[in-house]
């Protein structure tokens, strides 16, 4: 019974430390700040959250227009979510941007997510497209 209670207490402690906490924008890694300044210049930062667990850090920057930008612990972007509004495309690999423009004219990218193996974009018509890294078309799904 003691072991069981110890495991429960340890789990509760770990969970409590893994929650988002509000931080200042200048605490985001410089790479992340440069990304925000370059691609979202005129939009103001609303709030910044740090998700810090024992294994990794993740920064979430919420802009005044509702856009959310997530960074890993080094400040590399992981996700940009325009919440159904178009996002800037200057940071998106050219092969992906060109494929979307050519294959889905009159649409805009509203969300992009990246991990080590793939990039997924979501368009304003709700179509999602996955690309294997490096930038090879993978699949389209609705």
What are these language model-derived features?
Residues 1-23, 36:
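Bacterial Sec-dependent N-terminal signal peptides
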């Amino acid at each position: 019974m003691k072991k069981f209670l110890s495991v429960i207490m340890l789990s509760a402690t770990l969970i409590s430390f893994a929650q988002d906490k509000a931080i200042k924008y200048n605490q985001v890694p410089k790479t992340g700040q440069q990304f925000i300044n370059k691609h979202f210049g005129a939009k103001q930062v609303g709030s910044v959250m740090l998700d810090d667990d024992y294994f990794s850090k993740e920064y979430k920057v919420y802009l005044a227009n509702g856009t959310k930008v997530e960074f890993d612990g080094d400040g590399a972007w992981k996700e940009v979510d325009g919440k159904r509004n178009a996002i800037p495309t200057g940071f998106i690999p050219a092969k992906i941007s060109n494929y979307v423009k050519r294959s889905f004219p009159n649409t805009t990218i509203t969300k992009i997510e990246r991990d080590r193996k793939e990039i997924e974009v979501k368009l304003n018509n709700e179509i999602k497209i996955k690309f294997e890294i490096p930038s090879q078309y993978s699949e389209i799904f609705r």
